[in-house]
């Protein structure tokens, strides 16, 4: 009887944690909005509640509310709590370093993008995606009345937030790619980053390999929001209509936005854009392995649902990637796993 009660208690606790799972995301969002990690980091040592209060963006501060949020952040193991000279002080646990501004692995943009009210809205339409009413609309379209691409073009402030979030993710990926896959760029003199956003990814390549002429290629409203890095060229266009020629075409987190038919169309255009002698397409995307015990497995499965809801796309297993590349008329591929959520697929058209 005692064992059954313990099992019930554990099961109920698990369900309650699922029910309130959103709390972790939104408490994290509030910590970012209040700039708590940067305040403590800039102070140089753990801070008391009253010290933290004095540095918040507006006064007066509800210290009881702040205390309770900090208590939750400590339980999340993002912040630390210690007693120094008889006073309770709050510091930063290791994961909180990714909340500190000013370094290439800062994740603030990604946090604010993913927890934005509009970007969370499609998750409320997951049921409708399963009980298909004959509609081809994505959950994003059901929630916000338009597809994600038109929404971004019509809401420049959200587009900027989205681009900042993607740039955060890109910096994490490209840091690993450049360090762990440098031989991938041997023999390449030109590369085009298709759907490359504001140019963060290809700029990392330009810095690491100055001899490579790097170009970012994306929609006009995306290029318009680009900082205009001097190391790279920018071209506006639509990948379904034209892809500029280069020794290598790179696509980071692009194909997961689309269904198989559209991916094959994109891959065929990429094939036409690279030379027969040594040309290749570099795909940076997730490879699903549901049996894996990797720390990123749950996140990869979450991103698969995210793609389904927002774009109608999907994350793919290696077998699905193999079929996609074969159906696009490519001769072969090579997979390299890197220290990131994504892996690298070198697809060889000829």
Swiss-Prot record:
Residues annotated for S-adenosyl-L-methionine binding in this entry: 166, 170, 195, 218, 238-239, 252
Keyword annotations: Alkaloid metabolism, Methyltransferase, S-adenosyl-L-methionine, Transferase
Enzyme Commission number(s) of this protein: 2.1.1.128
Superkingdom: Eukaryota
Residue intervals passing through the bilayer: none
Tissue specificity remark: Expressed in leaf primordia of rhizomes and root endodermis.
Catalytic class of the enzyme: transferase
Activity regulation remarks: Inhibited by sanguinarine.
Residues noted as binding substrate in the record, renumbered to the chain: 169, 253-257, 306
A single MF term (Gene Ontology): (RS)-norcoclaurine 6-O-methyltransferase activity
A Pfam family per the record: Methyltransf_2
Chemical reaction(s) catalysed: (S)-norcoclaurine + S-adenosyl-L-methionine = (S)-coclaurine + S-adenosyl-L-homocysteine + H(+); norcoclaurine + S-adenosyl-L-methionine = coclaurine + S-adenosyl-L-homocysteine + H(+)
Function text: Involved in the biosynthesis of coclaurine, a precursor of benzylisoquinoline alkaloids. Catalyzes the transfer of the S-methyl group of S-adenosyl-L-methionine (AdoMet) to the 6-hydroxyl group of norcoclaurine to form coclaurine.
Family: Belongs to the class I-like SAM-binding methyltransferase superfamily. Cation-independent O-methyltransferase family. COMT subfamily.
Name of this chain's protein: (RS)-norcoclaurine 6-O-methyltransferase
Organism: Thalictrum flavum subsp. glaucum
Higher taxonomy: Eukaryota, Viridiplantae, Streptophyta, Embryophyta, Tracheophyta
